[in-house]
């Protein structure tokens, strides 16, 4: 490295110094106003996000209540079937098949609702 020559040093440029009032009005005031707008927009979005999340939770809660109600009804139906078996030997097989198909449909519907609930939970966690 070689030492710097005094000639190589650049003369400092003169910068126009503004009065404090002009500086505030020209530079700081627009920035402050923009920051206020950003804060207001963020506050509004925060409120909307809270309401969206609350709505999703209510929706999931209602879906869980529906699933619980269907499971309880299915259990009750199965218990009633066990307590009151059909007396006819011929019709017993066909009725049991019909009831088994009905239960399979109910279980499939509950499974679909559970899958939908899990998807909504995953979707709400990702957003």
UniProtKB/Swiss-Prot annotation:
InterPro entries associated with the record: MRFAP1
Entry's family note: Belongs to the MORF4 family-associated protein family.
Keyword Nucleus: yes
Keyword field: Coiled coil, Cytoplasm, Nucleus
UniProt-annotated stretches for the region Disordered: 76-97
Name used for this protein in its record: MORF4 family-associated protein 1
Compartments where located: Nucleus; Cytoplasm, Perinuclear region
UniProt GO cellular component terms: nucleus; perinuclear region of cytoplasm
Source domain of life: Eukaryota
Recorded coiled-coil stretches: 92-126
UniProt organism field: Bos taurus
Pfam family, one: MRFAP1
Subunit structure: Found in a complex composed of MORF4L1, MRFAP1 and RB1. Interacts via its N-terminus with MORF4L1. Interacts with CSTB and MORF4L2.
């Amino acid at each position: 490295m070689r030492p710097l020559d005094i000639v190589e040093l650049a003369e400092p440029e003169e910068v126009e110094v503004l009065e404090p009032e002009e500086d505030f009005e020209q530079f700081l005031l627009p920035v402050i106003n923009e920051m206020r707008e950003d804060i207001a927009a963020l506050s509004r979005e925060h409120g909307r996000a809270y309401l969206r999340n609350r709505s999703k939770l209510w929706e999931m809660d209602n879906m869980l209540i529906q699933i619980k109600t269907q499971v309880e009804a299915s259990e009750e139906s199965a218990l009633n079937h066990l307590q009151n078996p059909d007396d006819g030997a011929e019709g017993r097989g066909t009725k049991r098949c019909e009831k088994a198909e009905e239960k399979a449909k109910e279980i499939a519907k509950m499974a679909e609702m559970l899958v939908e609930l899990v998807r909504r939970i995953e979707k709400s966690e990702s957003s």
